[in-house]
């Protein structure tokens, strides 16, 4: 039984990944600080597994991280832990810099020391879950793994810095890394500050559906289960010292995406007054430094790992909308105590 240290395993992507590993009977050590976006419901779900252990810990905590590597035999570290919402990085970049850069440094440095201390070095690897946003806005074509990194937000700059740090450890110390750069994820349990769940919940509650700028910014969407499948395949089949893009099949403007969600809600949960959800759409001031388009070339992972996304956007949105409609106890608590849907990321 392999033992995996999952950092950020109570977050959106991390929790889905932990669940998948546990279902495959792997041993999981889930390390998470339990910030505002953590899903406590999933933590309770994981308690039933005998091969699971949770440790509340900040990845910036040098002493605790060092002790974890001292007390456990770890086959791989998969780091999801990060501050991830671009708007929050505009409001408060400090947490993004310290967590996404210094925290990753702490993990990488301790992983290197651990790797140097074990005999079976070929069995260990460090996987960093990065983002497509490190490439910046793409006017033509699609970003490949060797494309220039050109971040435009404090969030993407912090993730780019972590990527560069890891690459430097590979060049300097031969550190066994793999970096993953997925496109925008969506699906069940996503904290409702992100576009898709925010639009779904605002629509259900009859609130405005805010569209930044003219709504023509383009994103590439990836259903959460497809991303988890890709990460798991790379964990077992990926090549050390490589970067892998993980992209969805479809690019779409934000306004078209929101209108698609509205049309699905009109059918799945029609309003009593028969008004269309689309009437709630409201154009608001654009996000500062808003990237126009993200686009990934994922041919490398297809060729080397034989991975392709299985869930198209139409099907993924359908599944996601139905999940939020059926799990209002989960998100109503968040809306009441953590985040009511207010605008974030305004100009200073």
Descriptions of predicted regions:
Residues 141, 192-200:
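A glycine/serine/threonine-rich, flexible loop-to-helix segment
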Residues 161, 165, 169, 199, ...:
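Hydrophobic alpha-helix immediately C-terminal to the catalytic Tyr-X-X-X-Lys motif of short-chain
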Residues 4, 15, 20-23, 57-60, ...:
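C-terminal substrate-binding subdomain of Rossmann-fold SDR/epimerase-dehydratase oxidoreductases
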Residues 37-39, 136-137, 188, 253-254, ...:
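A short beta-to-alpha transition loop/helix N-cap that caps and shapes the active-site region
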Residues 116-119, 127, 137-140, 174, ...:
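Proline-centered turn/helix-capping motifs that create local helix->coil transitions or kinks
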Residues 1-185, 225, 319-327, 333, ...:
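N-terminal Rossmann-like NAD(P)+-binding domain of SDR-like oxidoreductases, especially those catalyzing
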């Amino acid at each position: 039984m392999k033992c995996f240290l999952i950092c950020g395993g109570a977050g959106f992507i991390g929790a889905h990944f932990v669940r998948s590993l546990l279902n495959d009977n792997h041993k999981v050590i889930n390390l998470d600080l339990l910030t505002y976006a953590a899903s406590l419901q999933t933590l309770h779900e994981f308690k039933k597994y005998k091969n699971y252990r949770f440790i509340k810990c900040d990845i910036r905590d040098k002493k605790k991280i060092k002790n974890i590597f001292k007390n456990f035999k770890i086959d791989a570290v998969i780091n999801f832990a990060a501050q991830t919402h671009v708007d929050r990085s505009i409001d408060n970049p400090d947490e993004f810099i310290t967590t996404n850069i210094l925290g990753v440094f702490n993990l990488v440095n301790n992983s290197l020391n651990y790797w140097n201390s074990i005999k079976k070095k070929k069995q260990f690897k460090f996987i960093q879950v990065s983002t497509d946003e490190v490439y910046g806005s793409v006017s033509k074509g699609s970003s490949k793994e060797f494309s220039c990194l050109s971040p435009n937000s404090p969030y993407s700059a912090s993730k780019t810095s972590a990527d560069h740090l890891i690459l430097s450890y590979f060049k300097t110390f031969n550190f066994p890394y793999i970096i993953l750069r997925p496109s925008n994820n969506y699906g069940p349990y996503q904290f409702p500050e992100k576009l898709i769940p925010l639009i779904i919940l605002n629509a259900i509650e009859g609130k405005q559906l805010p569209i930044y700028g003219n709504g023509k910014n383009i994103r590439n969407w990836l259903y959460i289960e497809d991303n988890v499948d890709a990460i798991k395949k790379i964990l077992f089949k990926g090549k050390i010292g490589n970067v892998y893009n993980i992209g969805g099949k479809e690019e779409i403007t934000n306004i078209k995406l929101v209108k698609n969600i509205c049309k699905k809600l009109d059918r799945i949960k029609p309003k009593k007054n028969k008004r269309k959800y689309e009437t709630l759409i409201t154009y608001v001031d654009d996000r500062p430094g808003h990237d126009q388009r993200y686009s990934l070339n994922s041919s490398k992972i297809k060729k080397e790992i034989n991975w392709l996304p299985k869930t198209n956007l139409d099907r993924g949105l359908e599944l996601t909308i139905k999940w939020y409609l059926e799990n209002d106890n989960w998100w109503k608590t968040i809306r009441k105590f953590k985040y009511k849907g207010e605008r974030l990321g305004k100009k200073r």
